[in-house]
């Protein structure tokens, strides 16, 4: 069973990456050629069987889509597409999205806290109600930080070279600081992506 594939550079208009070293269980080690192409020649595996994530290495680069290639269903017709990025790219994008989202949320929270304090000063709410509202905001802040820790890296790994319309909207929302909306759309995008992969895996 031969599995063909390509290695491309993240966010580069699908530029090929030559000289990548690849190994997989039950297949001899191989390297990408000048066009980023490679081929695994498995001795026992057959089309339709799942494989563990191949080991992918090139000095100065990091693997971007490990989750997608882990458990890959072998196919004679469908190439294994691997994406790599210069080291530090994902962390840089993650920090960028983190900073944008925190700044947007903090501004929103500061405005809400000021409104609550003004209501209390104007004696439109009681001390207890003021305390309850501020506690609710603090809980909202904790929930927000948990969400951003969970999703910032996932957003950073979305490859602009190969995204659907919903994933494009996700990145636009994140860049606008609208994390909750981005998370909702990202989860929808995950369902669509999984469905698309299952359909494509039927063609072996």
Predicted region positions:
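Short amphipathic beta-strand segments in non-cytosolic proteins
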Residues: 13, 20-31
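Extracellular beta-sheet/turn segments enriched in Thr/Pro/Gly and aliphatic residues
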Residues: 69-103
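A short, solvent-exposed loop/turn motif at the edges and junctions
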Residues: 47-72, 179
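Short, small/polar residue-rich loop motifs at catalytic or cofactor-binding pockets
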Residues: 3, 24-26, 159
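Charged/polar helix/coil "stalk" or linker segments at domain boundaries
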Residues: 113-204
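Structural motif
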Residues: 2-17
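Short, acidic Ser/Thr/Gly-rich low-complexity loop/linker segments typical of extracellular
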Residues: 27-41
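Short beta-strand/loop motifs in extracellular/secreted proteins, especially
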Residues: 18-20, 52
